[in-house]
From Swiss-Prot:
Gene3D superfamilies: Leucyl/phenylalanyl-tRNA-protein transferase, C-terminal domain, Leucyl/phenylalanyl-tRNA-protein transferase, N-terminal domain. This is Leucyl/phenylalanyl-tRNA--protein transferase. One of its GO terms (biological process) is protein catabolic process. It holds the Pfam family Leu_Phe_trans. GO terms for cellular component: cytoplasm. It comes from Pseudomonas fluorescens (strain SBW25). Its EC number is 2.3.2.6. The lineage of its organism: Bacteria, Pseudomonadati, Pseudomonadota, Gammaproteobacteria, Pseudomonadales. It is found in: Cytoplasm. GO terms for molecular function: leucyl-tRNA--protein transferase activity. Belongs to the L/F-transferase family. HAMAP family: Leu_Phe_trans (MF_00688). Keywords: Acyltransferase, Cytoplasm, Transferase. It catalyses: N-terminal L-lysyl-[protein] + L-leucyl-tRNA(Leu) = N-terminal L-leucyl-L-lysyl-[protein] + tRNA(Leu) + H(+); N-terminal L-arginyl-[protein] + L-leucyl-tRNA(Leu) = N-terminal L-leucyl-L-arginyl-[protein] + tRNA(Leu) + H(+); L-phenylalanyl-tRNA(Phe) + an N-terminal L-alpha-aminoacyl-[protein] = an N-terminal L-phenylalanyl-L-alpha-aminoacyl-[protein] + tRNA(Phe).
Amino acid sequence: MLTWLQRDSLTFPPLAKAMREPNGLLAAGGDLSAERLIQAYRHGCFPWFSQGQPILWWSPDPRTVIFPDELHISRSLGKLLRQQRYTVTFDQDFAAVIQACAAPRAYADGTWITQSIQNAYLALHQRGYAHSVEVWDNGELVGGLYGLAMGQLFFGESMFSRADNASKFGFATLTRQLQAWGFVLIDCQMPNDHLHSLGARAISRSDFAGFLRDHLDQPNTGPWVS
């Protein structure tokens, strides 16, 4: 039976209670307050729902992740990186990045990044938890991504690209920086071909929970929340 969250409690059910079908559905309801979102990521779940649906919380098994030292750089991406084809910045325009991620895609009917999601993650950005990566081409924003940093873990949320390999360029740059800062894992949530091309692989929910337990409260050497 699906658990419905109460607005006056930040408690989530155990991850083992998540449904097998649909894979990982853990709970519904609650709200998108910064406090609840922070607790959700610490617990091992994330919000994902469409316009008109209740807030749905997920913890899929297996979980798609990238270990920074396993980042795969294709020949074409490596060439762009060597040429420094684009300029990459962090936290320079979070609002523009999340708005671009929310824009309609040719391969999808709608977006899960509703206005309420945008507002919630902007609040997390203002608190220092959510971060953006911007990819620029001669001053024009052509790609980027956003996610949350906690301890030695980065939780990726969404990315966009308006130019050849721009989002991969930004992701590769971020991954190298995260590794230098002592991050050990990037949570990618759900699998897709784009992520697999960058080296993503699946780990069990229990293994993912172990990374949360061991690394959420460990310091990183970067400027982000630790």
